[in-house]
């Protein structure tokens, strides 16, 4: 029983970390109809920034600095790689996103010399706590609480602020929003900023559990977060969060059995099933092309 509780708690924690990445995917897709393949690498860069900054700065200085730099990185990627292609075919933008992904990985490879980097210990999340007889780390408890708080704040921003209203309008009809005078570039930049911030927070929690950072550290979490977004209905924030929690729990339960080698395969098998059975996901809306 204690083992099952520990696995479920770990799954909820992992799912919360995937959720913070998945929200970035689903928000960008909702606005631009773009799969930002570089998003997982922004997550990885946030982890590397913490490694390098904690080598010479206190943790309480490194964390806010890392959050700011990650946000600036996301903003810079949008301005340099996506904004010039705003009117280009979607394939061109997707290729640009893949190019940015490999660029970030190669910059990380150069910065680390190809050596795995040990993530610094964060004292406020690395302690242990006992829940229902199962011993687990504080990060396991903090993650779902933090995710819920951040999602509620994000939902408030989207539903009760001027920029949120603009984001909903652009997501509903990009061209009409432009004609109505909505500042499209500002809306898109804010979307990338929010997504990058949440990915940075996710990196703090994720690398506390998996404290080794390499240039490809963002690849698998990024892909799984993307699957979570598709599962929940890409473009739906609640859907992305629920999908991420389901994937995180299922993954850790599989890892607790003799079938642990298939824990990653399950996620991608789920993606195939979703695309065949319900392409719009759990909460997604069927899109219609305007003529």
Regions found by a protein language model. Give the residues of each.
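Helix-loop-helix "hairpin" substructures at the membrane interface of multi-pass membrane proteins
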Residues: 14-15, 134-213, 237-242
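Transmembrane helix-bundle core of multi-pass membrane transporters
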Residues: 84-160, 187, 253, 258, ...
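Alpha-helical transmembrane segments within multi-pass membrane transporters and channels
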Residues: 58-100, 107, 242-247, 278-279
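Membrane-embedded helix boundary and interhelical linker motif in transport proteins
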Residues: 9, 31-76, 80, 257
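Membrane-interfacial amphipathic/re-entrant helices at transmembrane-helix boundaries
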Residues: 1-20, 49, 59-61, 88-95, ...
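Transmembrane alpha-helical segments in multi-pass inner-membrane proteins
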Residues: 18-20, 57-68, 192-199, 206-269
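Short, non-helical or kinked segments that cap or interrupt transmembrane helices
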Residues: 16, 25-47, 87-92, 163-166, ...
């Amino acid at each position: 029983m204690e083992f099952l509780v520990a696995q479920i708690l770990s799954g909820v924690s992992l799912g919360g970390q995937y959720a913070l990445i998945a929200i970035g995917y689903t928000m960008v897709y909702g606005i631009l109809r773009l799969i930002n393949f570089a998003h997982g690498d922004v997550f990885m860069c946030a982890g590397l920034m913490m490694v390098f900054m904690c080598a010479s700065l206190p943790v309480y200085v490194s964390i806010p600095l890392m959050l700011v730099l990650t946000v600036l990185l996301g903003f810079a990627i949008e301005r340099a790689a996506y904004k010039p292609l705003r009117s280009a075919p979607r394939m061109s933008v997707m290729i640009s996103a893949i190019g940015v992904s490999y660029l970030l990985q190669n910059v990380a490879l150069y910065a680390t010399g190809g050596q795995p980097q040990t993530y610094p210990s964060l004292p406020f999340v690395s302690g242990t706590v006992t829940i229902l007889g199962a011993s687990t780390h504080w990060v396991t408890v903090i993650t779902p609480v933090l995710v819920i708080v951040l999602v509620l704040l994000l939902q408030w921003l989207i539903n009760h602020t001027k920029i949120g209203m603009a984001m909903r309008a652009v997501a509903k009809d990009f061209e009409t929003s432009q004609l109505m005078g909505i500042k499209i570039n500002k809306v898109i930049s804010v979307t990338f900023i929010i997504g990058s911030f949440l990915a940075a927070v996710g990196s703090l929690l994720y690398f506390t559990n998996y404290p080794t950072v390499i240039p490809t550290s963002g690849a698998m979490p990024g892909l799984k977060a993307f699957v979570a977004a598709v599962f929940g209905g890409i473009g739906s924030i609640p859907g992305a969060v629920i999908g991420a929690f389901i994937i995180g729990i299922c993954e850790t339960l599989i890892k607790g059995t003799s079938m642990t080698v298939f824990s990653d395969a399950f996620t991608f098998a789920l993606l195939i099933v979703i695309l065949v059975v319900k392409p719009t996901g759990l909460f997604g809306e069927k899109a219609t092309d305007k003529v």
